[in-house]
Amino acid sequence: AKIAFFKSKNFSARDVAKLYVEEASIYRFTNNINSEKNLLYQALRTLLPLEKNSGLPKKNSLYPENTFLMIFDALAEIETNAERKIDYYDLSFYVSDLIKDNLVSQESLIIQQFEDRKRTEQCLKIFWLNYQKTKNNFWIDKAFLYAERSKNVILKEQSNLKTLAELHPNNKDLQLQKQLISEQETLINQLIRLQITGENPNEIENINSKLATITIELKIYNEKIQKQFKTEIEKELSISDLYAKIKIDKTQLVYFFWGNQSVYQFQISDNKMVWNQINLEAKFTENLKKFIHFFDDASLINNNIQLFTKTSFELFEALQFSILEKSKNTIIIPDGLLNFVAFDALVTQKTTSKKYSEIPFLVHQNKLAYQTNATFYIKNTPKEKQNTIVGFFPIFENTNAELLYSKEEAKALLPFKALLFMNEKATKANFLKNSSQYSILHLSTHGTSGSFSEPATLVFYDDLMLLNELYALQNCHPQLVVLSACETGIGKLQKGEGAMSIARAFQYAGAENILFSLWKINDYASAQLMTNFYEDYAKSNSFFEANYNSKIAYLENSDIANAKKSPYYWSAFVYYGAVDSAENNYLYYLFFGGIAIIILFLIYGRTSRLFKSKKI
């Protein structure tokens, strides 16, 4: 076959390199490592004919080519030297980044990211072994940075573009890129709708043609923006900045990386990082899934409270939460199946109590907030609240989908002079018209988590809203989105990117903080919790504190029956956002105010010297 291939004369360097890689894989099966390695380097020289160095190629000689990934990954797998193994993986990461620069759809980026996650896990294995041997914190820091680099690449890219647009509001390339991304998501939404309904098949071809044109245009603008803002875009997370943020927030952070064989956990507090490994053994995964499935139906916990508390405590122990500092704000950055865990409902001690208000839930020990990645945690600082609220309450009266207690929930917004769209006025058009004009968006409606073939949806009075329509939102940067709807935090789980949920779609669009549910919550409990939330927010002016206190108030409410105090009812809502308590707000204003004064002082000094020099 090889002789016939070369006789054909109709081949490229890429074809030859791939042939060498395939031949090398045959030697893998016969355990002939030297022959495999020689063929892989032969493939490398074929792709880099001008590279004279016989060792590792220089990064600036590489280009976006999938065959490089096959070569470097294979070399890493057969390499026995740990340091050189990492060097090969780093070259794969570099080429993967070059490839991602040319990708313009979320779907293609997710596929590319999937392979990066596998490489990251291999690197973490090496760092873990080195840490076990040396106990040198250098390996913890390195592992954390690699884990963070693999998290939410698409969301981070969107966040970077938003920041660039704020810093360079008149840049035409950024404006056109933003418009093209919005048009792309709008077309994808139209395509998905047509595929679901089976209507107008001819229009599908037309949309695909438009998408192909946009793809070409986006590649051009992406390249322009990469060249213009390369130094501003490529900034790696600083661990010292992370420690500084944790100190200001007076918090501790629990960070997870979910791999194929292990879950790696980083507990960070007071300039100290502890690294743990949790093996994905059957006992751990079964217990985790059992805990998650307790929230599938309201009756499951109530029917067997003791089994639930036992399962919950075992998970608490398995996640090594027992070493958390008590009575301290805690940020959780979940991953994998942990995205679907209501950590508030973990039980911190063995108990036989069947009275929910007496069960030692984690919510009584620590105030929790969540984030998707450490970069977002650092960037998400408390801002002065605008407190302009718009609410959407379709209610769906006299239908099987009626939300009976949604009216009570709406009353909680009245003291804020909120604009409320009730019943038939809670339309998709009114949402699109108003979503960019208010600092808090409140949606009390139905939501779906989607399926393998269909995306998650948000239900308005007159129509469904699919994920891609939310991705396409422009100038939608609310300080808070409240999703008082079923399953708004659930969606198809993608490695590294998390659940493709309604909540993530709002993050993608630009929401700063989000409060959403993890399962089909009872609308009475939802109304009660939201009432508690806004009553507390009116006093505390803190999303973080209001979310915590709404749950405590619910558990302490003597008018609510014990069965309704099951964590199924009160722990569904999770808050992804800043720790914006009053004390922290003061510290941030003091910190940034101090920086502003220093800048003004420097400008004044420079101006004074300039005037003096002119007088002379």
Predicted regions and their residues:
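Catalytic-core domains of enzymes
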Residues: 162, 226, 234-238, 270-276, ...
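Active-site-proximal beta-strand/loop segments in catalytic clefts of secreted hydrolases
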Residues: 333-336, 392-396, 423-424, 443-447, ...
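Catalytic cores of nucleophile-dependent amide-cleaving enzymes
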Residues: 372, 439-528, 532, 600-601
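Residue-level detector of buried hydrophobic side-chain packing
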Residues: 150, 254, 265, 330-332, ...
